[in-house]
Amino acid sequence: MEGETTVGVGPAERTTLAGHEHLLLGEAPSLTLTELACRAGTSLETAQKFWRAMGFADVTPDAVHFTEQDVAALQDTATLLDETSESALASASVLELLRAQSYTMDRLVLWELETFVTDLSERLSLDDTSARLVALDRIDSLVDLLSRQLNYVWRRHMASILGRTDAEVSARGREDTGPDLYPLIRSLGFVDIVSFTQRAQGMSKAALTHMLEGFENTARDVITSRGARVVKTIGDAVMYISDDLLVAADVVTALVDELQKGPDAIRVRASLVEGRVISRSGDVFGPTVNLASRLVDAAEPGGIRLDEATAMAILHSPEASRYRVGQCHEVVAKGLGQIVPWSLERTSPVRL
């Protein structure tokens, strides 16, 4: 049939896929998009927007593709759109929430599957194709556990961000307002691998994977354990953020130190800037982010670069004695013109 991709898939593979489908979706698909909309009490247009916002390709109205779980999810979405409901949200906001979930879940399941495949490949000495076939056979044993962990982690992180938000708004005094004012004051920066492209060209696949995994895992451990958060990783770079400047200073100095020691040392450079940002789609934006991006480019291997305002804030902080701050030579930054970076070093030992 048109649109189906079953070429090369044998009965055993189809049985395995059907088993995954039943475990994850509760049953085999039996409803069309038109029937889904009818069962959920919504319009076909709403059902189409729902499915697209969930991150999936469009399906024709008469294609059998949905289950009762999809009906329940669409009904929940319709409740959020219902103006008589206490939890009603604007249509655009509902779609934004769905996109946030779908984008995160798409990356999460990919990450989980690739971790499982890599584990099987290494432990059982399998090639990539064999490891994926074994993963397809064994993934069902992890589904319930991963689902429970997902619910737990979501609740933990929601509780954490609500706590941080409460503390932040409680500490705010009277503040300037205006349509062009970035609402959040944050301390953030980048840490990237020096000469990554040149270094990667001479590395094997295994060595490159080992280096990137070591870089990302160390970055996540140091950043989160010291009270900051990872905004995103970009291959050879990581962006971190904190609500507190001194926490951010502790994080970036500790991370640069940690990455550059031991047998697997990686030469890195970093930046730190305090300023106003806006948060959208799980990311942060604004001139502060742009400046931090340019400052890391100006840093020497092993160096950390700040702007003057951030440097002065650290110098006048209660923990000024822990750091050495110095003015650097003027540089030309792309899109910003001439800027004068400042350096940051720790004078006291890194706390464990």
Task: Show where each model-derived region lies.
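A generic structural signal for short hydrophobic patches within well-formed alpha-helices
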Residues: 196, 248, 277, 310-314
